[in-house]
Every structure is written in C-alpha cells, then in structure tokens.
Amino acid sequence: MGRGKIEIKRIDNATSRQVTFSKRRSGLFKKARELSILCDAEVGLLVFSSTSRLYDFASSSMKSIIERYNETKEDPHQTMNASSEAKLWQQEAASLRQQLHNLQEYHRQLLGQQLSGLDVEDLQNLESKLEMSLKNIRLRKDNVMMDQIQELSRKVVTT
C-alpha cells in the first residue's frame, strides 16, 4: 500500500524541517546519481539549505557541467560537436535521397513505366490508385463544366 499524499507547504517546526530537508536531499541526490548511471547523462545538482549551506552533486566535474551549461545558454545550437552534427546531416541527406528515389519510382509507375518489378498485388494496387485518380479528375472536370454552364446561363439571362 502506498503512502498518503501530504500537503506541500512550509514546515513550521525547525527541527522537523531540517530532518525533512536532510531526507529529501539525500533522496534527490540518489535520483540524480541513478539518472547519471542509467541514462549515461551528465548531471549537476546544486542545493542551498535555508542556512545557506551548499550541497552539490556532479556525475563528472561540476566546473565542466557549468561551463557546458553557460555555452549552451549563450548559443543553444552549439550543443553538438562538429562530427555529431556532420553525421546528423549525412543521415538526413541519405534519408532525403531515399525519399526522392521512392517518389521517382512511384511517379514512373503512375506513368506506366518500370512495371516489370511489380507483382500482381502491386499492379492491382496501382490500378486502384489510377482508377481513383481518374475518378477524381472526371469529378473535377464535371464541376468545372457545370460552373462554366452556370456562368454562361447567367450571362445569357443578363443580356
């Protein structure tokens, strides 16, 4: 059975407040350490008590974490190093090339070219898509023609 929820408000009794601070601080530091280990994250934690005492935790060097924080704060787009960024752009370019290739192949299939690699199911799917496209084209053509007829009828009536 879980613990009941407590109301989050300032603890008036100084001794109780200090005990709670100490327990919660150690729990917070434990969670920070676990996050660092489990997720291979660089974690820095600073806590000042009500008596201005400093408590800190750093998974590596607090100085390097603070420097990294300041650099990121100044230029948030500089969080990746050059090789990571280059790798990211290479992956993006490869993905876009593959997308372009797939679209070109699909376009050729719609034009009736390069159908030799398709099996019966693929050909049936392509046929269905073409029939749907043809249906949409005919519907659009009918709508345009109806609009033109109505426009001509209005012109005849007004003259």
From Swiss-Prot:
Expressed in seedling roots and developing seeds. CDD domains: MADS_MEF2_like. Residues 86-159 form the K-box domain. It is found in: Nucleus. PROSITE patterns: K_BOX, MADS_BOX_1, MADS_BOX_2. One of its GO terms (molecular function) is DNA-binding transcription factor activity, RNA polymerase II-specific. It comes from the Eukaryota. InterPro entries: MADS-box/MEF2_TF, MEF2-like_N, TF_Kbox, TF_MADSbox, TF_MADSbox_sf. Residues 1-61 form the MADS-box domain. Its main location: nucleus. GO terms for cellular component: nucleus. SUPFAM superfamilies: SRF-like. Keywords: DNA-binding, Nucleus, Transcription, Transcription regulation. GO terms for biological process: positive regulation of transcription by RNA polymerase II; regulation of transcription by RNA polymerase II. Probable transcription factor. This is MADS-box transcription factor 23. It comes from Oryza sativa subsp. japonica. The lineage of its organism: Eukaryota, Viridiplantae, Streptophyta, Embryophyta, Tracheophyta. The gene is MADS23.
